[in-house]
Amino acid sequence: MALKHFNPITPGQRQLVIVDRSGLYKGKPVKSLTEGLSKKGGRNNTGRITVRFQGGGHKRTYRFIDFKRRKLDVVGTVERLEYDPNRTAFIALIRYEDGELAYILAPQRLAVGDKVVAGNSVDVKPGNAMPLASMPVGTIVHNVELKPGKGGQIARSAGTYAQLVGRDQGMAILRLNSGEQRLVPGACFASVGAVSNPDHGNINDGKAGRSVWRGKRPHVRGVAMNPVDHPHGGGEGRTSGGRHPVTPWGKPTKGKKTRSNKSTDKFIMRSRHQRKK
């Protein structure tokens, strides 16, 4: 889908660039595949703010997305492509031969009327799901599982994908968008193709209000605060903070490595940081 630019009738439209969604379904989602979604405002179960600068935003309905794709060897037809406010990608409504309905992440080049199927030995075409062990090397995939049966976790955002670059002792070697190469069990399912809406990275909100509509409040810099609120706060006139960047709680940030998951280090063959050297 293309990008839309506007004549600057108002200041907020001068820089505005949005994705043209005219090709998507304009009605409401399937009621049986949705549930209510309450606003958290960045607060946890005790009512304290755990994520700053969140709150407000337009009301949403949550759509249940089938990330597992375990309805094997049952052909489904794409009924329509829909917008989903809870993610950057578009979603596709699938009607299976037995009458069941499901939402899946829509890959690029998937159109209304196309057939999709999940199975151990199915065609390599966009929207089909199969184990990584069944795919030819070089295949572009998305919605990749990290544990068999857990559901897709990798490459689910708009325009993202991973590439199967090799195999090693029952494991598949994937190259991710970040440049990282990692091992994933060959029994893990993945969907063929890249995720839809690749132009998402080119949008320009044009005004602060659009971020507020999404539930994002103004992100205040530490140097603009008082000393009581942030380690960078205070000072006479404008200051640069006077120390290496830290979080409001004094921990180093902006480039400081924070990864501490030693148990999965063995699955990372090439770090995403090596690419930059």
Curated annotation (Swiss-Prot):
Q: Name one GO biological process term.
A: cytoplasmic translation
Q: Which GO terms describe its molecular function?
A: rRNA binding; structural constituent of ribosome; transferase activity
A Pfam family found in this protein is Ribosomal_L2_C
Q: Which GO terms describe its cellular component?
A: large ribosomal subunit
Q: Is NADP among this UniProt entry's keywords?
A: no
* Region (Disordered) residue spans: 222-277
- Name the source's superkingdom: Bacteria
Which InterPro entries does the protein's record reference?
Answer: NA-bd_OB-fold, Rib_uL2_dom2, Ribosomal_uL2, Ribosomal_uL2_bac/org-type, Ribosomal_uL2_C, Ribosomal_uL2_CS, Ribosomal_uL2_dom3, Ribosomal_uL2_RNA-bd_dom
The protein's assembly and partners: Part of the 50S ribosomal subunit. Forms a bridge to the 30S subunit in the 70S ribosome.
The family note in this entry says: Belongs to the universal ribosomal protein uL2 family.
Its function, per the record, reads:
One of the primary rRNA binding proteins. Required for association of the 30S and 50S subunits to form the 70S ribosome, for tRNA binding and peptide bond formation. It has been suggested to have peptidyltransferase activity; this is somewhat controversial. Makes several contacts with the 16S rRNA in the 70S ribosome.
Q: What is this protein called?
A: Large ribosomal subunit protein uL2
Q: Which organism is it from?
A: Brucella anthropi (strain ATCC 49188 / DSM 6882 / CCUG 24695 / JCM 21032 / LMG 3331 / NBRC 15819 / NCTC 12168 / Alc 37) (Ochrobactrum anthropi)
Q: What is the lineage of its organism?
A: Bacteria, Pseudomonadati, Pseudomonadota, Alphaproteobacteria, Hyphomicrobiales
